[in-house]
Every structure is written in C-alpha cells, then in structure tokens.
Amino acid sequence: MGRLMRGKVIYGTTLIGLFLFLFFYFWIPKHHIERIHHHRIKQVDAKSDLTGFKTHLPIISIDTKQQVIPLVTKEGGKYVKARDNINVDIELRDSPSRSHHLSEKPRIRTKGLISYRGNSSRYFDKKSLKVKFVTNKLKEKKHRLAGMPKESEWVLHGPFLDRTLLRNYLSYNIAGEIMSYAPNVRYCELFVNGEYQGVYLAVENIEQGEQRVPIEKSDKKLHKTPYIV
C-alpha cells in the first residue's frame, strides 16, 4: 500500500512539474520573440590576405586617447570616487556569424563613454566596463552590438573568477528561455589602446527601453517614477 502511494506521489509531482514547465515556456509572454544563442550561430571563415590577430568572435576596440579610466581610490582611510567616465573612440568588428581580423575595416566607428563597473570586482586584474555609445556632441546614440538590438548602454563583463567563461553566458540564456526578459549576451574579444584584454561578455545593460525592460519611461517633472528592483 505504501509503495502504491509513493508511486502516486511521484507520478503526481512529475505531472505538476511538466505542467509548470509547459506553462512558463508557452504561455508566459517573452519580451524577445526569438533568443539567439551565440554558440549556435554558424561561423563563416572570412577569406582575407590580412595578417595579425584573427578570431571567430566579434572584436571591440577602445582608444582612451591616453586617458586613464577612473577608479575609486582610498585616501586617508576614505574611499574617493573619481569622475564617472571618460570620452573614448570605439570600433566594432562584430558580425557574430563570421571571423574577424583586427586590421579589417570596422563596421562602426563611434564615440563612447566608459567607466569601470562593479565594486570589489573593479580591483580584479580583468575589469568589467560599462559602455555608452554617444555622438560627437556626447548625446546618446544607439547601435547594434554583435547582432543584439540597438541600444546605447552596454556592459563588457570580464569573467575573472569564472575560468570556464560559461557561468554568466549560460545563466543569461537559460533565464531568457523561461522569463519575459533576460539580458542578451555575446562573447567578444576586447582591445584597449591596442592591448589585448581577453575574452569578454558583451551584455545588455538592464534598463528601461523597448528592447530592454518594457516599463514606462520616467518623467522628471513627476514625483513618482517607475523603477527596477
């Protein structure tokens, strides 16, 4: 009798789990109609006589124009925050479906504002960056990045502690399959002032936007505002 009851419990639990999976997968609306997984994109080897650095990943090149990226410092036992960002030049060689050479013509040349991202992680050898595309007059400018929808603000995450480079990539993509929105993500190679920084994750910054979190845009004239928890 006990074995029969145990079998019914297992059977019922399995059915409930299957129902919940189907409900979340088919009935919960997704903000992204079709999520593109970077590892599933077919790669085409770009035939070229160019020499030098070559990769099957998108290449992001940043020129700080001899400026030092601001970093929070400790003076007299107190943390002092430097200015938030610096104005830089950015080049994107970022088709996710073919290989790239560092010496090839970039798809996009644009101005940008960059700063370090994170608290304790900004002291790692491999630092994460927050990037905002702007015009020559430092006004917000939206660009596609590695096939992801147009936006101005992006995160270049340097997975310093995760030597597999898989943890955040898998987490974002699994979340994107079951949630209404999770940031899109692409692998990329990062160069700063011509020096190779390693493999990074280009990630959508979590913010209000048609292609990001679809909430009402805040009005500075009103006291109430939408927010993201």
PLM regions: where:
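Phosphate/dinucleotide-binding and metal-coordinating scaffold of catalytic cores
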Residues: 2-229
